[in-house]
Amino acid sequence: CYFLAGCSLNNYKKQPFIPAIQKTSTLVGLSVLSIFCFLISFNTKTIDVSPSYEDKVEAAKLMTDAMSILKNTRMEKGVFIDIENDPNETGLVGSPYSLITTDEGDLDAKLTTLDPNFSAAIVDLMVQINLHENDTVAILMTGSMPGANMAVLTACKALDIVPICITSIGASQWGANQVDFTWLDMESVLYQNNFISKQSIAASIGGRNDMGRLLSLAGRNLIMENIAYHNLPLIRTDKLAKNIKERMEIFSSILPIQNYKAIINVGGGVASLGTSFNLKLLPPGVINRTDITDIGRPGGIEGVFSKFVKSKVPGLHILNIKSLIEQFNMPFAPIPIPEIGTGSLYAEERYNLIVAAICLLILGGSVFAVGLHSKRKIKEHLIQHEPDSLL
């Protein structure tokens, strides 16, 4: 008996008890399972297509065609494209100086708006403020960003939104600052070819005080002649505040201000934005009443955009282009222009959370099962070999 007991004790010492959770084979198995679950979760993704995908594509295609016909119109006049400053050869980048150039301009911002996908971004913003078919919106434009003007108007066309536009013609560098091809000239070509549904209903000179201050007399006369050529009412008084008031009266003659579904400002026109708040603090994109009141300052002149927004009309502010496109993960001044329908603006790739949750449950359950099994075996081992340890 003593001999058998001794043999049994020797076998116990030679083969010590190891819980399953400490076995190398178990740990290797759990590691392999972890890697397998990770690979499945990582490689199983879903594509979330934007609900407004079709409208975005339509708007971008409209803008592509609109840019093409404007380029052809420009080329018919024997104009050469400056490839250095217009690398995508749109033919729609202005010059650094002209008689109707009002301010300095950011060339890269102008190039960014001459991407048809910018129209798709405008559609996204319009959807954010719940614009629908047959809604009427007020639009404030300048000649500084013809690409952004086109983007807004083609987005309106794609969504069947009614735009009521007032424009200031003066333009900053690289914008629609060619005396023989102003924004009104571009707008007319687009309207005649059915790329946009409406033209501007009135126009001003633009520039400082909205009256062309710092422009030469010849420059101001050229703008006024261009406005007269397009048979538009000229907004020109002796004060900025009166120019703003006249704009409000024109918009009110079409529809009561509170009945407009949105106010869209394109560019930095002083009549549009006024001087009643710090312009640099106004973020691009969707603007609500508090966004204006929080940055207000006393003594300034309230612009048209601010008056609309304070009347609880939703606003879209299309300026500070780099900050704006960062909201949509779009490239700044892209070369070449990206394809329509690609990028997170149209569809976003996401990890499949259901698959990830299932993998987590499988892995967590496996670890729990091994731990539970090990605990039971440890308890049995202690009862068999050291019964007093449980007391």
Label for each model-derived stretch:
Residues 3-19, 386-391:
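N-terminal Lys/Arg-rich, disordered targeting/topogenic segments
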Residues 25-42, 361-364:
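Hydrophobic membrane-insertion alpha-helices, especially the h-region
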Residues 158, 164, 171-173, 180-185, ...:
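Conserved mixed alpha/beta catalytic, RNA-binding, or beta-rich assembly cores of soluble enzyme
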Residues 180-259, 263:
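A substrate-binding/cap region within the structured catalytic cores of diverse enzymes
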